[in-house]
């Protein structure tokens, strides 16, 4: 009986106190809210907010050494604990700007899914998938930086609107590869 209680307590501690997921996957129709930003602002940062987004991927390799495409999982994620804002410096445009960063990551997750679907993998699948990922990730980072530069981190409202439209068009273009 004591063993059963001890096992029950250990399971409660192990699973009962687990925090919310460390990442939040991109979902169509779901927009970020300020409550999703749970991190603390970087000391000395001149920015009003920062969203930490990226792409995660998981693959299964068959006994032949080739990736099983049907079991591949590619997601764009938002990382709440690494994302933050300064309440006194934000407005509705700031949140839209941060959402566009998340949407850019989703565009690249779709591009990654498309590349995987079209690629003919060999027994060298692990290296091949890493090459594809590195190329997509480089493109994602470049686009994120270009977005911030051209919109002046959400200050240039006209550039912001153009970028929002551009990213929405890309989401539509890559819709067949939505998660």
What is the role of each PLM region?
Residues 21-69, 78, 121-179:
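Metalloprotease/metallohydrolase-associated module, dominated by Zn2+-dependent proteases
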Residues 66-90:
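Active-site scaffold of zinc-dependent metalloenzymes
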């Amino acid at each position: 009986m004591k063993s059963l209680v001890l096992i029950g307590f250990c399971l409660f501690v192990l699973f009962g106190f687990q925090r919310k997921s460390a990442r939040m996957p991109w979902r169509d129709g779901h927009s970020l809210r300020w409550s999703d930003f749970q991190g603390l602002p970087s000391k000395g940062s001149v920015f009003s907010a920062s969203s930490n987004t990226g792409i995660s991927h998981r693959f299964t390799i068959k006994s032949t050494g080739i990736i099983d495409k049907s079991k591949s999982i590619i997601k764009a994620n938002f990382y709440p604990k690494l994302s933050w804002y300064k309440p006194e410096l934000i407005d509705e445009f700031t949140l839209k700007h941060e959402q566009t960063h998340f949407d850019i990551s989703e565009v690249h997750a779709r591009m990654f899914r498309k590349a995987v679907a079209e690629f003919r993998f060999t027994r060298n699948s692990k290296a091949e998938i890493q090459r594809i990922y590195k190329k997509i990730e480089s493109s994602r980072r470049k686009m994120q930086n270009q977005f911030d530069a051209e919109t002046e981190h959400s200050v240039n409202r006209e550039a912001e609107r153009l970028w929002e439209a551009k990213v929405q068009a890309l989401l539509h273009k890559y819709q067949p590869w939505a998660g």
